C-alpha cells in the first residue's frame, strides 16, 4: 500500500517523499539497519536530491532514521517507542477532554458522530485510507476543541507519525480481522455519547480502554515486522 495521494494535495515533493518513506518504515518495508541512498530515492521518485534531503531531515527529527556519512540508516519504531507514542496520546486526550467535558458540547458531538458515520461508510466499502483518516480526525477534533496552544504544538509535532501508524494498523486490521473495525466504530460512538452526557468518569475509562486495545492491535500488526528483525 502506498501513501494515499488524496492526503497529499498541496504537498511539496519533499513532503510527498517524506510521507511515502515514513509509511514504508512504519510498515516494515524498510527494516531497521537498512541504509537509504539519496541517489536511489531520487531516482525512484524522479527528482533531484534536494527534496530527498528535505525528507531525510524530517524523518531524522522523528527518530525514524539516523543520518550518517554513508547515508541514512533506518531505525524505525521499537515497541517501547510505540508505547511512548500511545502514552503521550492518552495523556493529551485525558487532559483536553477534562477541560470541556462539563460544557455544552453539542457541536463537537455532532461533528464526532459525522466522522463516525464516515468510518462506517469506509468500512462498508473497505476503504482503508478513508477509515484511517476519519479515525484520526475524530481524535484530532478532541485535541483541537481544547484550544490549548502548547498541547496543540506537541500534537502537531507528531500528527503525521500518528496518522501513518493508524493507516498501517488499519491496513493490517482490514486484512486479518476486519470485525475489529466495527468494534472500533462502536467504541467511538460510545465515547461521543458519554461526552454528550458530560460523564467524565466514563470518558476516562473509555480513553484508557481505547489505548489499551490500540496498543494490543498495533503490537499484533505493525510491530510484528520489527520482532522478526
Annotate each predicted stretch with a short phrase.
Residues 85, 112, 131, 135, ...:
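Hydrophobic packing residues in well-ordered alpha-helices of helical domains and bundles
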Residues 95-121:
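Amphipathic alpha-helical dimerization/coiled-coil segments
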Residues 115-116, 125, 167-229:
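C-terminal all-alpha effector/ligand-binding and dimerization domain
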Residues 1-102, 150, 215, 219-229:
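Short linear motifs at protein or domain termini
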Residues 81, 105-108, 124-131, 147, ...:
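Residue-level recognition of alpha-helical structural elements
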Residues 88-101, 137-176:
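Hydrophobic, amphipathic alpha-helical faces that serve as interaction scaffolds
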Residues 93-94, 116-117, 135-139, 185-189:
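Residue-level signal for cytosolic alpha-helical hairpin/rod architecture
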Amino acid at each position: 500500500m502506498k501513501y494515499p495521494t488524496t492526503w497529499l494535495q498541496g504537498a511539496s515533493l519533499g513532503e510527498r517523499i517524506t510521507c511515502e518513506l515514513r509509511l514504508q518504515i512504519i510498515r516494515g518495508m524498510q527494516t531497521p539497519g537498512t541504509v537509504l541512498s539519496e541517489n536511489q530515492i531520487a531516482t525512484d521518485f524522479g527528482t533531484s536530491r534536494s527534496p530527498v534531503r528535505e525528507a531525510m531531515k524530517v524523518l531524522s527529527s522523528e527518530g525514524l532514521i539516523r543520518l550518517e556519512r554513508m547515508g541514512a540508516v533506518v531505525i524505525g519504531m521499537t515497541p517501547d517507542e510505540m508505547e511512548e507514542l500511545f502514552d503521550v496520546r492518552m495523556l493529551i486526550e485525558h487532559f483536553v477532554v477534562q477541560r470541556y467535558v462539563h460544557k455544552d458540547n453539542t457541536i463537537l458531538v455532532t461533528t464526532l458522530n459525522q466522522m463516525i458515520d464516515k468510518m462506517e461508510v469506509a468500512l462498508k466499502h473497505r476503504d482503508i485510507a478513508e477509515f484511517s483518516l476519519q479515525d484520526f480526525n475524530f481524535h484530532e477534533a478532541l485535541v483541537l476543541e481544547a484550544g490549548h496552544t502548547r498541547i496543540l504544538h506537541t500534537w502537531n509535532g507528531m500528527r503525521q507519525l500518528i496518522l501513518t501508524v493508524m493507516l498501517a494498523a488499519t491496513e493490517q486490521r482490514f486484512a486479518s480481522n476486519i470485525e475489529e473495525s466495527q468494534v472500533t466504530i462502536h467504541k467511538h460512538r460510545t465515547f461521543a455519547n458519554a461526552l454528550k452526557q458530560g460523564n467524565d468518569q466514563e470518558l476516562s475509562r473509555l480513553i484508557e480502554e481505547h489505548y489499551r486495545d490500540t496498543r494490543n492491535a498495533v503490537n499484533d500488526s505493525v510491530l510484528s515486522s520489527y520482532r522478526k528483525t
